[in-house]
Amino acid sequence: MPNKKTADPNEKLILGVEARSAVELIKHRHGPGVRFVFSDNNNNPEGNIYTIVRFVENVDHPEAHVEPHQHEFESLFIFKGSNPDMTGLEAEVMFDDKWYPISSPRAVRIPAGKVHTYRFVKGSGEYWNIVLTPGANYNRTVK
């Protein structure tokens, strides 16, 4: 009888990453730069963490691509500039109706139920968005 190889259940814990537009999300448009999805309901349906990173280069004016919204669960924004000390990216985060300037490196905690959005203002770097959500399904939590 041939030796039958069984699938290693741990392999599904190693997630593939792919570039995708934000248009798949409620209240989002394409947006600047390139967006990479690290964890969502497509590659991690048993998980509870949605994670993306967006790379932008040479931003020279404010550009919003996300409408103000809220989630049922907490999330975290991470702004990391392209310089060795992680500076080099300027953004703004809106809570309720007020904009707050962000200079990288910086993390911003978004409590559950807090109306928010963000926009890049100037520079180059990375934006990470980490959302705690059942089944890693971002759209399930947007209001």
Region annotations inferred by a language model:
Residues 37, 50-55, 75-80, 92, ...:
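Ordered hydrophobic segments in well-structured contexts
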Residues 101-122:
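Conserved metal-binding segment of the jelly-roll/cupin
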Residues 81, 96-98, 113, 121, ...:
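Short, loop-centered acidic/histidine patches that primarily coordinate divalent metals
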Residues 1-21, 121-143:
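Double-stranded beta-helix
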